[in-house]
């Protein structure tokens, strides 16, 4: 049997209880395949499922039926320990906190699904419950084996997050300052899961077999990069030339032509110009 601790989120706990109720008492005859989605059906509010945290892609969001992956994961572990044939299993995008790396099995309607087959010679029965802060699943049947199973895992690769920068203006509405961490990075892993069989009588290791790879995603760290406030782009300009106090136009010098000798003829009836020798400029 397998037990995994659950949180005290009321909606999530209600979903766990509904899922366990649907599983409890299911019987598989030899050769039959169990489907988690077929057994539970679509998770809807009409069936009593509530909105609770669940992964959607890379984000943790509220979904109707959120949390039931803990039930499918606990069942997956029990199926491995019973040495049943795993038909279909998918790990989460990120490690979960209620079970070991490589031992989780995510489900969603319609896909992914979790399936296993009764590869024994006798019927098996699933018992599932929520009690004492734990999800409990055990698979009952006729034990023909002279060995018992233990599961283990190895983190074969680690993928460190990189740092990404997001640009903001100095007066950004979020109020970010330069260097503020917007999103913490998440380390990714490649996990290999193994099944070891030990002789019941002697405890001697009989075999150790590879079961599955589980690739958990890397999420880069995001840091705010805020522009420096800019200085005013215009400054008072200095006149290119000092203002002149001199007149813009130089006065014309008086003509040097000597006065005309008065004519001996009689004066004309038209009066001569008083300044006939000037150029006329001001």
Placement of each model-derived feature along the sequence:
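Well-ordered beta-sheet/strand-loop patches within structured domains
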Residues: 1-282
């Amino acid at each position: 049997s397998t037990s995994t601790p659950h949180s005290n989120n009321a909606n999530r706990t209600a979903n766990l209880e509904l899922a366990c109720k649907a599983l409890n008492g299911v019987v598989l005859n030899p050769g039959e395949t169990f489907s988690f989605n077929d057994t539970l059906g679509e998770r809807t509010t009409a069936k009593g499922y509530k909105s609770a945290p669940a992964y959607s892609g890379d984000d943790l969001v509220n979904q109707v039926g959120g949390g039931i992956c803990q039930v499918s994961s606990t069942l997956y572990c029990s199926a491995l320990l019973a040495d049943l044939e795993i038909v279909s299993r998918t790990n989460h995008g990120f490690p979960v906190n209620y079970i070991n790396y490589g031992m989780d099995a995510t489900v969603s309607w319609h896909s992914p699904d979790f399936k296993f087959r009764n590869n024994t010679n006798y019927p098996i029965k699933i018992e599932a419950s929520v009690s004492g802060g734990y999800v409990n699943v055990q698979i009952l049947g006729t034990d023909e084996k002279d060995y018992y199973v233990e599961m283990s895992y190895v983190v074969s690769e680690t993928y460190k997050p990189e740092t990404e920068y997001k640009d903001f203006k100095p007066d950004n509405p979020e109020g970010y300052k330069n260097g503020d961490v917007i999103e913490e990075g998440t380390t990714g892993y490649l996990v290999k899961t193994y099944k070891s069989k030990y002789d019941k009588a002697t405890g001697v290791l009989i075999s150790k077999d590879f079961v599955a790879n589980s690739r958990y995603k890397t999420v880069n760290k995001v840091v705010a990069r805020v522009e420096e406030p800019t200085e005013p782009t215009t400054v008072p300009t200095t006149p290119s030339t000092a203002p002149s106090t001199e007149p813009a136009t130089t006065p014309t010098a008086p003509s040097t032509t000597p006065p005309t000798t008065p004519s001996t003829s009689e004066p004309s009836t038209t009066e001569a110009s008083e300044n006939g020798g000037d150029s006329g400029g001001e």
